[in-house]
From Swiss-Prot:
It comes from Bos taurus. This is Centrin-1. It is found in: Cytoplasm, Cytoskeleton, Microtubule organizing center, Centrosome. The keyword Repeat applies. Its main location: cytoplasm. Plays a fundamental role in microtubule-organizing center structure and function. Plays a role in sperm cilia formation. Ca(2+) 1 binds at D41, D43, S45, T47, E52. PANTHER family: EF-HAND SUPERFAMILY PROTEIN (PTHR23048:SF59), MYOSIN LIGHT CHAIN 1, 3 (PTHR23048).
Length: 172
């Protein structure tokens, strides 16, 4: 009697490269996305018109730019039908909601540095946080960190500069 069992090969057992955790929504968030989709699926066909994508996203609190909309439509409407299914809409919104969460997390971290609420991270703020975290960094190293993130040359790091450097380092 021949067995259908095959011994695993090196190729079949090798680790796939991790791309990072796939963003997921809570059931409540999925329900919100479904309700926004259904608002624009008036005929109950299970699809919405690509022209309605922006309005549906606005209903969920997002303000996508024109270039971003073109890119999203190209990603989800590959056949050029002008229609988007709920699953495609859910995929787009899952990504957008994950990005929003990431931005909020980064801004929370920014506020921990900005304890004097100036809207900027100064050398003094950075030095305090480094000390609190037990990081043994020289003043020169701390200044280099400020200089690396400071795009407008004012010697401090504002929210936009902080967001940019955190995304660039892939820490978020």
């Amino acid at each position: 009697m021949a067995s259908s069992y095959r011994k695993p090969t090196v190729a079949s057992t090798s680790q796939k490269r991790k791309v990072g955790p796939k963003p997921e929504l809570t059931e409540e968030q999925k329900q919100e996305v479904r309700e926004a989709f259904d608002l624009f699926d008036a005929d109950g066909s299970g699809t919405i018109d690509v022209k309605e994508l922006k309005v549906a996203m606005r209903a969920l609190g997002f303000e996508p730019r024109k270039e971003e909309m073109k890119r999203m439509i190209a990603d989800v409407d590959k056949e050029g039908t002008g229609k988007i299914s709920f699953n495609d809409f859910l995929a787009v919104m899952t990504q957008k909601m994950a990005e929003k969460d990431t931005k909020e997390e980064i801004l929370k971290a920014f506020r921990l540095f900005d304890d004097d609420e100036t809207g900027k991270i100064s050398f003094k703020n950075l030095k305090r946080v480094a000390k609190e975290l037990g990081e043994n960094l020289t003043d020169e190293e701390l200044q280099e960190m400020i200089d690396e993130a400071d795009r407008d040359g004012d010697g401090e790091v504002n929210e936009d500069e902080f967001l940019r450097i955190m995304k660039k380092t892939n820490l978020y």
